[in-house]
């Protein structure tokens, strides 16, 4: 299982939100490239980038920052989400050196787009499913649909999606532990690997994820915990490596 540091981009800065609310943000750095360097130096093996402005506006806003990070670390797998709603945007990011693009809102509103993206960019597409009470939320979490997470995940099994990033919005940024039962249930219900996200606070939460014994969970995204110092990236990754030998 990979420990994946999150870098959320808002107005060119590295921030963290609470429960997806743009008005409830904390700025942790005005230099996201330097922040990426910190996590790379700390031993991370993948980075999770989110263009928060892009998620709300429906197109990339902080793309220059994403490109700068990808160019600085050409051998590091990077995944980017937020505002990815066209094949042109995906192509732009792939050419910039990004390893994976995360399709969120567009995947819910136009599932066929995911199939198109997977055909055009095989192995490069991740679907981001963000949920409130088991129902998928869209448009920067501003809207909640009537679509259930597991039902939608199953629709993408035949498309060649590389992974699903599952976020429980109620947990995100609250550092009260992630929704392990539902994450494990999602991993068991689909053949697509799952990356857990939202609410990780400390090493105990990582251990709890490992204790779920869900082989389909291949990663855990962490944000506020590593920024506020309640979780150490290297220590968490070492725990995962020991447990999964």
Swiss-Prot record:
What enzyme class is recorded for this protein? isomerase
State whether keyword Translocase applies. Answer: no
| Chief location of this protein within or outside the cell | cytoplasm
For this UniProt entry, what's an example GO CC term? Answer: cytoplasm
Task: Provide the active-site residues from the annotation.
Answer: 8 (proton acceptor), 130 (proton donor)
Q: Name the Enzyme Commission number(s) assigned to this protein.
A: 5.3.1.16
Catalytic activity entry: 1-(5-phospho-beta-D-ribosyl)-5-[(5-phospho-beta-D-ribosylamino)methylideneamino]imidazole-4-carboxamide = 5-[(5-phospho-1-deoxy-D-ribulos-1-ylimino)methylamino]-1-(5-phospho-beta-D-ribosyl)imidazole-4-carboxamide
Q: Would the keyword Cytoplasm be found if you checked this record's keyword annotation?
A: yes
Metabolic or biological pathway: Amino-acid biosynthesis; L-histidine biosynthesis; L-histidine from 5-phospho-alpha-D-ribose 1-diphosphate: step 4/9
Family note: Belongs to the HisA/HisF family.
Protein's UniProt name: 1-(5-phosphoribosyl)-5-[(5-phosphoribosylamino)methylideneamino] imidazole-4-carboxamide isomerase
């Amino acid at each position: 299982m990979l420990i994946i540091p999150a870098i959320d981009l808002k107005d060119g800065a590295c921030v963290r939100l609470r429960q997806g609310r743009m008005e409830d943000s904390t700025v942790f750095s005005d230099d996201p490239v330097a922040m990426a360097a910190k996590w790379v130096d700390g031993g991370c093996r993948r980075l999770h980038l989110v263009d928060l402005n892009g998620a709300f506006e429906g197109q990339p806003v902080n793309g220059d920052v994403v490109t700068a990070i990808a160019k600085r670390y050409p051998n590091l797998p990077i995944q980017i989400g937020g505002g990815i709603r066209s094949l042109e945007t995906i192509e732009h990011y792939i050419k910039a050196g990004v390893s994976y693009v995360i399709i969120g809102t567009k995947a819910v509103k136009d599932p066929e787009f995911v199939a198109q993206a997977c055909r055009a960019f095989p192995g490069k597409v991740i679907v981001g499913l963000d949920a409130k009470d088991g129902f998928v939320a869209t448009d920067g979490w501003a809207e909640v649909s009537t679509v259930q997470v597991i039902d939608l995940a199953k629709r993408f099994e035949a498309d060649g999606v590389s992974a699903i990033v599952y976020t429980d919005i109620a947990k995100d940024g609250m550092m009260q532990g992630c929704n392990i039962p539902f994450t494990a249930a999602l991993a068991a219900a689909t053949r697509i690997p799952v990356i857990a996200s939202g609410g990780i606070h400390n090493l105990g939460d990582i251990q709890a994820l490992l204790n779920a014994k869900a082989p389909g969970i291949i990663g855990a995204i962490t944000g506020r915990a590593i920024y506020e110092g309640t979780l150490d990236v290297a220590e968490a990754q070492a725990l995962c490596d020991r447990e999964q030998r």
